[in-house]
Amino acid sequence: YDESFEKYNIESGNFELLQKADDDAIKKIEDGEEKIKVYENFYLDKETKEVDSTIRLFKNRKDIDRICIMDGELPSADDEIAIDRMYADNNKLKVGDSLTVGDKKLKITGLVALSDYSALYSNPSDMMFDALKFGVAIVTDTLFDDYGEADLHYSYSWKYDKTPADDEEAQDMAEKVMKHINGISMLTQFIPEYSNQAIHFTGDDIEGDNTMITVFLYLVMVIIAFVFAITTGNTIAKEANVIGTLRASGYTKGELVRHYLATPMIVVLVSAIVGNILGYT
C-alpha cells in the first residue's frame, strides 16, 4: 500500500472549479507560495442500465494517479470501458460483458484499480463507501468528450514540488494552496490527500487490523502459557509419589524437570514452526 504512492504518483490533493481554468489561470495557481504541478483530472458521473449504480468516468491518466490493470486491458476503441475490479465483482460483471453507461452501450475490456480510489467513496463527506452502487472507470478520450459537458466536473489534481514532511506540514501547505486558488478562480471542492478517504481508508483499515491481530496474538500466548502452567502443576501434584520414588532412585531435579517439560515444549516448538511456515507462505 505505502509503495503505491510513489509507484502510481498519487496526487497531493485535488480541487474542483466552477469553470474550466485556462492556461494562464493554471500557471498562476502553480506559481503560488507553495509551488505545485496541476493536472487535469476531469470526470463524468453517469447512471448505468444493467445494474442500479452510478459510474464515474475518467480519461486514461498517465502522469498522475496512474492506473493498475488487474485483468484484461485498457479501452482502445470508443465503445469500450475498463471498470473498477471491486465494483465489477460486486455487480457480477466481467471482461467481455456489456454495460450501458448513460446512453451508450460499452464493452468491458478490463478490470482496473484507480490509485486515488482504493476505497470507492463518491463523496468525501460520505460515512462509508459503496462499491455496489458506485464505481469508477476509464474510457478513451474521444468517448469521454462525446458525452458532452452536461455532467462534466472540472476537477484538477496537484502535486507539490516539495513533499511535506508530515500531515501537520501538509495541512499548512494545503491551506496556503486553497487560499491562493480561491483568489484566482471559483472553488467548489478542495480535498488534500491526507484527508481523502478514497485514498487513505484502505491503509488505515489495514493498520487497524494489524494492531488488533497483534494484540490478539499476545493474548493467545498469555492464555496458552497459563493453560500449560496449570496443566503442568496439576500433573506434578498428581505424580508427587512417583517423583519422590524417582528422586530416591537417584534421578536429579534437572532430569525430572526435562522429563515433565519435554512434551509441552515439543508441542510449542512444532506449533511455532508450522505456524510460521503457513504464515509466511
Label the model's feature ranges.
Residues 1-225, 234, 253-254, 267, ...:
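Membrane transport/envelope proteins' first extracytoplasmic loop
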Residues 98, 245-246:
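Short alpha-helical segment immediately N-terminal to, or the first helix within
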Residues 227-230, 260:
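Short hydrophobic/aromatic, small-residue-rich stretches within specific transmembrane helices
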Residues 96, 250, 275:
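Conserved G/P- and acidic residue-centered "switch" motifs that form tight phosphate/ATP-binding loops
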Residues 247, 251-266:
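Amphipathic cytosolic juxtamembrane alpha-helices at the membrane-cytosol interface
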Residues 229-241, 265-281:
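Small-residue-rich transmembrane alpha-helices
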